[in-house]
C-alpha cells in the first residue's frame, strides 16, 4: 500500500513541477488553430436521450430514463423528460449542417440501445428503423467531411433488461451488451472508426445507485428516502463491475471479429475532476490520492492492469467484486484510446473512515468539497457542482499520462452551462472564456508530452440535462423548445468557427 501512495506522490510532484498558473481574472486567452497539431480533431458532442426525441416512435423500446423521467416527473427539476428533447431524430440534418458551418471535423453522438434492440437483447428482435436512423446520421456526417465518434452506452439502459434482471445489477447484462455492441460494429463499423463503449460509468454508479438522483434512482434509504430501493454500500460496486466487464466484452468482440477488416479503434469515456489536497499535509495529499482512486482510477486501473486500485481493495474489502483470472486477462489493455470528460475540480480532505451509514461516497475516507476556507476553487457556472478550474484539465491529462502508460487521449466532453431564461440568449461570453482557458491548458499538456488527439465541446445543442431537465443550457447552439426546437448559434459557436478558420479571437 505504501508503494502505491509513493508512486502517486511522484505523479503529483511531476505535475507540480510542470505547473502553470490559470488566472481566472486575466483576459480571455487568444488561441489559433495552429497552436494545436495539424491532425488534432475539434468536434462537439451530444447523447441520444438528451437530443434525439422520438422516444416512442419507429419501434424504439423504453429505457430507464424514459421510465425515470416520465413515471416520476418530480425527480426532474422542471418535471420534464426527453421524449421530444431537441427532436434530432427528425432534425439530424440540421445538426450536421451546424457542425459543418462551425467547422468541426468530428461529432460524438451516442446510439440508443433500445432503438436498436427494443427489449435490450437479441431475443426481442432488432429494430431496422433504428439501424436506418443511425446509418442516415453517419452518412450525412461523412458527406460533410465530419468523422463519426460513436458511444454505445450513454446511461440509457433498456427498461426491459432492468425489469428482467436489474439491468447492470445483473451479470447477464455483460452478454447482452456484447451482443448489442456486435450489432453496432456489424452495421456501422465500415464507416465508424472511433467507438466508445461507455460514457461516464462513474456517473452511472454514483448518481444512479448511491445518490439516487438519476435513473434508475436507487440508493440507501438513509441517503435519500425518496429512492425506490437500493444499497449504496454494495450495489454501486456490482454495477461498476458489470459495466467494466461489459466494456471488456465489447472490445473483445471487436478485436476478434471486426478489427482486421474495419481497422477502427475502441475506447471508453471516463469522467473525473482533479482532486487537490485541502492542505499540504501528508494526510490530505493521501486523501486526494484516494479520491482519485475511487473516481478516475476506478475504471482506468482495470483496463491497464486487470485489477482494481489498491485503495479500493483496502477500503471496500469484501464488498468489492473480484475479477477472475480470465476476466483480468480480457480487461488488461482493452482500449485503443481513453476519452476524458472534464468540467470541474475539488479539494479532498482526510476524514475518519465511516462505520455507520456506509456508502461508496464514504469509502474513500475523504471529504470532497468545492471550496477551501469558504473560498470556492473557481467561479460557479449555473450548476452548483460546476466550479471553473481550467488547470484541472491539464493536471488530469498529465496524471493519466504518467500513471497509466501514456495513453492516447481525447477530451470527449468539456463545457459549462447557463440558466435557462424566457428569452433567446446568444451572447455567451462566459462560455467562450471557459473554452479558451481549458483549450489553453490542453495545449500546454500537449506541449509537455500528453498524447491528446482531439477535443469535443459539450454540447452542440442545449438539451435535456438529466435531473436538471431544461433549466440549464450547455449548448453552443440555442434551442427554442417552445418553437419547434429551432436552432440559433450562440456567440461561442462563432468563436469556434473563427478559431477553426485560423482567425485570432477578439
Curated annotation (Swiss-Prot):
Query: What does UniProt list as catalytic?
Result: 200, 413
The enzyme class is hydrolase
Q: Specify the glycosylation sites in chain numbering.
A: 24-25, 81, 226
Location of this chain's protein in the cell: Secreted, Extracellular space, Apoplast
Which positions in this protein are listed as binding a beta-D-glucoside? 50, 154, 199-200, 343, 413, 458, 465-466, 474
Q: Which InterPro entries match?
A: Glyco_hydro_1, Glyco_hydro_1_N_CS, Glycoside_hydrolase_SF
Q: Which domain of life is it from?
A: Eukaryota
Q: What is its EC number?
A: 3.2.1.21
The signal peptide, as residue positions, is 1-22
Keyword annotations: Apoplast, Disulfide bond, Glycoprotein, Glycosidase, Hydrolase, Secreted, Signal
User: Which cysteines does the record link by disulfide bonds?
Assistant: 219-227
- What does UniProt report on the pH dependence of this protein? Optimum pH is 5.0.
Q: Which molecular-function annotation in GO is an example for this chain? A: beta-glucosidase activity
Q: Which reaction does it catalyse?
A: Hydrolysis of terminal, non-reducing beta-D-glucosyl residues with release of beta-D-glucose
Any one biological process term the GO annotation gives: carbohydrate metabolic process
Induction of synthesis: Up-regulated during abiotic stress recovery.
For whether the record's keyword set contains Hydrolase, the answer is yes
Task: Write down the SUPFAM superfamilies for this protein, in alphabetical order.
Answer: (Trans)glycosidases
Gene Ontology cellular component list? apoplast; Golgi apparatus; plant-type cell wall; plasmodesma
Its biological purpose is as follows:
Beta-glucosidase involved in the rapid degradation of flavonol 3-O-beta-glucoside-7-O-alpha-rhamnosides during abiotic stress recovery. No activity with quercetin 3-O-alpha-rhamnoside, quercetin 3-O-beta-galactoside and rutin.
**What family is reported?**
Belongs to the glycosyl hydrolase 1 family.
Protein name listed in UniProt: Beta-glucosidase 15
Species of origin: Arabidopsis thaliana
Identify the coding gene: BGLU15
Amino acid at each position: 500500500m505504501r508503494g502505491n501512495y509513493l508512486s502517486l506522490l511522484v505523479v503529483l510532484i511531476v505535475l507540480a513541477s510542470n505547473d502553470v498558473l490559470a488566472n481566472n481574472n486575466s483576459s480571455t486567452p487568444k488561441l489559433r488553430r495552429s497552436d494545436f497539431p495539424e491532425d488534432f480533431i475539434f468536434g462537439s458532442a451530444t447523447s441520444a436521450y438528451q437530443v434525439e426525441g422520438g422516444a416512442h416512435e419507429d419501434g424504439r423500446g423504453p429505457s430507464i430514463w424514459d421510465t425515470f423521467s416520465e413515471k416520476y416527473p418530480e425527480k426532474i427539476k422542471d418535471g420534464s423528460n426527453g421524449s421530444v428533447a431537441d427532436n434530432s431524430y427528425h432534425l439530424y440534418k440540421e445538426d450536421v449542417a451546424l457542425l459543418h458551418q462551425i467547422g468541426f471535423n468530428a461529432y460524438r453522438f451516442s446510439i440508443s440501445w433500445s432503438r436498436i434492440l427494443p427489449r435490450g437483447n437479441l431475443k426481442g428482435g432488432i429494430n431496422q428503423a433504428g439501424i436506418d436512423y443511425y446509418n442516415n446520421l453517419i452518412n450525412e456526417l461523412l458527406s460533410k467531411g465530419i468523422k463519426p465518434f460513436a458511444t454505445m452506452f450513454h446511461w440509457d439502459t433498456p427498461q426491459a433488461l432492468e425489469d428482467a434482471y436489474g439491468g447492470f445489477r445483473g451479470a447477464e447484462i455483460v452478454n447482452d451488451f456484447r451482443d448489442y455492441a456486435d450489432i453496432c460494429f456489424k452495421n456501422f463499423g465500415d464507416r465508424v472508426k472511433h467507438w466508445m463503449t461507455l460514457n461516464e460509468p462513474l456517473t452511472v454508479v454514483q448518481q444512479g445507485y448511491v445518490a439516487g438522483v438519476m435513473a434508475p434512482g436507487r440508493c440507501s434509504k438513509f441517503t435519500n428516502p425518496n429512492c425506490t430501493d437500493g444499497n449504496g454500500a454494495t450495489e454501486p460496486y456490482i454495477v461498476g463491475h458489470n459495466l467494466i466487464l461489459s466494456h471488456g466484452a465489447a472490445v473483445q468482440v471487436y478485436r476478434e471479429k471486426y478489427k482486421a477488416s474495419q481497422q477502427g479503434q475502441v475506447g471508453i469515456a471516463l469522467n473525473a475532476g482533479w482532486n487537490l489536497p485541502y492542505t499540504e499535509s501528508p494526510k490530505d495529499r493521501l486523501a486526494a490520492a484516494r479520491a482519485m482512486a475511487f473516481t478516475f482510477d476506478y475504471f482506468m486501473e482495470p483496463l491497464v492492469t486487470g485489477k482494481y486500485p489498491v485503495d479500493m481493495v483496502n477500503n471496500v474489502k469484501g464488498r468489492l467484486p473480484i475479477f477472475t483470472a480470465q476476466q483480468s486477462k480480457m480487461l488488461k489493455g482493452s482500449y485503443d484510446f481513453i476519452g476524458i470528460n472534464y468540467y470541474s475540480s475539488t479539494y479532498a480532505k482526510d476524514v475518519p473512515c465511516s462505520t455507520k451509514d456506509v456508502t461508496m461516497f464514504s469509502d474513500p475516507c475523504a471529504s470532497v468539497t468545492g471550496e477551501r476556507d469558504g473560498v470556492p476553487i473557481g467561479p460557479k457556472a449555473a450548476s452548483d457542482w460546476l466550479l471553473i478550474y481550467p488547470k484541472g484539465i491539464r493536471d488530469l491529462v498529465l496524471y493519466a499520462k504518467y500513471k497509466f502508460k501514456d495513453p492516447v487521449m481525447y477530451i470527449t466532453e468539456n463545457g459549462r452551462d447557463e440558466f435557462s431564461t424566457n428569452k433567446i440568449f446568444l451572447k455567451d461570453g462566459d462560455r467562450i472564456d471557459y473554452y479558451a482557458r481549458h483549450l489553453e491548458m490542453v495545449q500546454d499538456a500537449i506541449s509537455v508530452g500528453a498524447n491528446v488527439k482531439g477535443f469535443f465541446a459539450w454540447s452542440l445543442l442545449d438539451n435535456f440535462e438529466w435531473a436538471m431537465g431544461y433549466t440549464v443550457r450547455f449548448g453552443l447552439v440555442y434551442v427554442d423548445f417552445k418553437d419547434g426546437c429551432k436552432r440559433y448559434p450562440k456567440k461561442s459557436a462563432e468563436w469556434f468557427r473563427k478559431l477553426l478558420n485560423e482567425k485570432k479571437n477578439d
